[in-house]
């Protein structure tokens, strides 16, 4: 009995039995930086997504056809923050403002804020991040971006409002860094709760 409990605690502390390899990547890189996974390289139009079951990066398909953005290419590297869970059941989306990088890569990212849209009346947050050593390394908040590079936010707002069918993505407001980090932390806690629930629901084999 005690050995069963001991094994349970070991597995419980090992990221709650990650369902795929991506889940093993930590939420934070350090105190001030998060990890970020690139699904779509900046300057490209093909839709790629992580398969939730296998953790493999695959071309996104709809009705048997590969999806390609019918608009201008992505204005930055696009992907997600691992070990988060948003309202639609997917990880938190993030766009990286620095140079284009190959898809399927992880990088450390400094979150500076977010843009709040609604998609079919559902909340859709698009988080904004910069590399701590890149072009925007001195930008630490969305206020800095508004002051130093206001056109960047206008580009992001216009792009996300337009890359789907007109009127589908409705812009509501910009979100400052403090609120964005709170939303991000809540999304991580939600991911942890789900993993814990999944673990508890899976009985372990008895070891004599």
Language model features by range: what are they?
Residues 16-208:
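Hydrophobic N-terminal alpha-helices or hydrophobic patches in metabolic proteins across all domains
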Residues 2-13:
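Sec-dependent N-terminal signal peptides
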């Amino acid at each position: 009995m005690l050995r069963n409990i001991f094994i349970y605690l070991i597995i419980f502390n090992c990221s709650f039995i990650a369902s795929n390899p991506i889940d093993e990547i930590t939420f934070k890189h350090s105190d001030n930086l998060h990890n970020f996974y690139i699904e779509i390289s900046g300057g490209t139009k093909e839709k790629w997504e992580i398969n939730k079951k296998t953790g493999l990066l695959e071309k996104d398909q709809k009705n048997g056809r590969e999806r390609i953005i019918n608009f201008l290419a992505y204005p930055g590297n696009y992907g997600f923050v691992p070990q988060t869970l948003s309202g639609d059941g997917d990880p938190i989306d993030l766009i990286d403002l620095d140079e284009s990088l190959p898809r399927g890569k992880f990088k450390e990212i400094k979150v500076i804020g977010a843009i709040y849209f609604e998609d079919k009346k559902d909340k859709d947050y698009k988080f904004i991040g910069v590399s701590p050593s890149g072009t925007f390394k001195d930008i630490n908040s969305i206020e800095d971006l508004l002051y130093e590079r206001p056109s960047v936010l206008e580009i992001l707002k216009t792009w996300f409002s337009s890359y789907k069918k007109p009127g589908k993505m409705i812009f509501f407001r910009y979100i400052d860094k403090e609120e964005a980090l709170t939303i991000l932390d809540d999304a991580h806690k939600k991911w942890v709760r789900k993993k814990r629930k999944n673990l508890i629901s899976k009985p372990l084999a008895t070891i004599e």
